[in-house]
Amino acid sequence: MVNLESFLIEAKKQTYANEKVEKVSNTRQNSKDYEYKKDKMVYHDTYFGGTNFIGEEVVYVDDKTYWAMNYYGVTLDETLGEEAMDKALRPALMNVGKDKDIIPVRGPKEWINGEYKYSFDVTGNINCFSGIETIYKNNEKIYELKCNGGLIK
């Protein structure tokens, strides 16, 4: 039996969110890729860009596409560069799964780190969902991401 939510929590903490983890070889020109494997399940995250980026996450079970999510994120204050990612996004994403009332496809519903506030609002369930992730610095919105995904049949 597939426990997708538990696997996603493990995988996300062992890929992009974890700054200690190295990328794997890119699968497409100029892509940045991460991969996590456990038993018969594989998680692959590939994205393009830096402060403005687009990407997708795919879960394979027994070598078959099982679940996927795509996302597009924009840093609204370009002077911050990677600062928002390092001080707010990655640490927030490491808290995936802490809120039991929200599906583990990004971070928690809300997370605060000093002057940064992360929030994620999602509708639907792990089978079919859409969400908006935002980061504020001193109450000013500096980043937004939209995502959607679900089971692949």
Q: What is the predicted function of each stretch?
A:
Residues 1-153:
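Cysteine-centric segments in proteins
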